[in-house]
């Protein structure tokens, strides 16, 4: 099957929805951040501390390209589809869905998470600024937008229906 890439801000529900969706569709779900941690042999905070965000983004690009060829459901990291290159790869390879969740909801989920170095080391205002900057990029790199206000099972069902009628020639 062609991949389904889930994108959106940190804490929008990509990983949760991805697991449910993969189960419904009988395929694998890859959490891109988890894959990078497993491949690098260290946590994302350790990668950031040791090599910096730029190196992490390079690993993210490599992982995204690998899963573009494999398929399944890919829960991207919050910054994975910000680059033009990654956005094009994802749109060309599969179906991209932006889970559009209110900032306050995302913030409530991520504000104290030490495994999210950007969130953990940023103020609420800095994260809101990042959210506002990223949202138009998620929109530009997505085929579909689904409200993150629904329960995860509903979001997964909506994505499954979209996938069944998606025209893969439109990437």
What role is predicted for each listed range?
Residues 6:
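Hydrophobic anchor at the beta1->P-loop junction of P-loop NTPases
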Residues 9:
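P-loop (Walker A) phosphate-binding loop of NTP-binding proteins
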Residues 13:
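Conserved glycine(s) of the Walker
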Residues 16, 20, 24, 135-171:
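NTP-dependent small-molecule kinase module
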Residues 32-80, 84-88, 116, 124, ...:
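ATP-dependent small-molecule kinase phosphotransfer cores
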Residues 70-71, 93-94, 141-142:
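Short, well-ordered alpha-helix to beta-strand connector turns
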Residues 78-81, 102-104, 151:
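Short glycine-rich anion-binding loops that position phosphate/pyrophosphate groups of nucleotides
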Residues 92-136:
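A glycine- and Lys/Arg-enriched "phosphate-lid" helix/loop adjacent to the NTP-binding pocket
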């Amino acid at each position: 099957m062609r991949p389904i890439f889930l994108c959106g801000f940190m804490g929008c529900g990509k990983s949760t929805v991805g697991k449910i969706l993969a189960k419904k569709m009988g395929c694998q779900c890859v959490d891109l951040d988890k894959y990078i941690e497993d491949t690098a042999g260290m946590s994302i905070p350790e990668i950031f501390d040791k090599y910096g965000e730029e190196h992490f983004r390079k690993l993210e690009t490599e992982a995204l390209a690998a899963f573009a060829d494999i398929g399944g459901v890919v829960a991207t990291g919050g910054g994975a589809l910000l680059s033009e290159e990654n956005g094009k790869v994802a749109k060309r390879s599969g179906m991209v869905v932006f889970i559009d969740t209110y900032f306050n909801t995302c913030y409530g989920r991520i504000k104290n998470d030490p495994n999210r170095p950007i969130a953990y080391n940023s103020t609420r205002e800095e994260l809101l600024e990042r959210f506002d900057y990223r949202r138009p990029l998620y929109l530009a790199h997505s085929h579909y937008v689904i409200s993150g206000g629904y329960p995860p099972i509903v979001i997964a069902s909506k994505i499954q229906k979209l996938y069944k009628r998606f025209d893969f020639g439109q990437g």
